[in-house]
């Protein structure tokens, strides 16, 4: 069987939050590979860590949260080099990745998508912003 490099790989990811001096272990040792073109749904009960885990891919954890163990790697960068997302700390580094390389639509579409615009218009708007394209080229 042929093996390919995933576009996104998480290995033994642990995420903790500091809550008034106490440590909350929100995620304990998750492994995940997503292949190019693959669609993945992460499901679970409310409070099970779905949003925390996926926010960690984008550097969107709350200020009191951190990846304390493990790695998250992105292998789809335009220049072919892997990006170790779990090591990015500065907002300026995330700005090079977020929207340009990876993006996400949060689970509540009413707060993520504008009901007055088509989805195509909203995707084109993101492309215009990040890729500096206009009109049809963005669509």
Question: What is the predicted function of each stretch?
Answer:
Residues 1-139:
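ABC transporter nucleotide-binding domains
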């Amino acid at each position: 069987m042929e093996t390919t490099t995933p576009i996104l790989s998480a290995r033994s990811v642990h995420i903790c939050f500091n809550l008034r001096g106490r440590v909350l272990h929100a995620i304990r040792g998750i492994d995940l590979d997503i292949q190019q073109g693959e669609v993945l749904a992460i499901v679970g009960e409310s409070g099970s860590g779905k949003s925390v885990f996926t926010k960690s891919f984008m550097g969107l954890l709350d200020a009191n949260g951190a990846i304390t163990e493990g790695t998250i790697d992105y292998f789809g960068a335009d220049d072919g080099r892997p990006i170790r997302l779990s090591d990015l700390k500065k907002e300026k580094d995330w700005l090079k990745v977020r929207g340009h390389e990876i993006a996400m639509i949060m689970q509540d579409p009413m707060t993520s998508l504008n009901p007055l615009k088509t989805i195509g218009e909203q995707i084109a708007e993101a492309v215009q912003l990040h890729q500096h394209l206009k009109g049809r080229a963005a669509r």
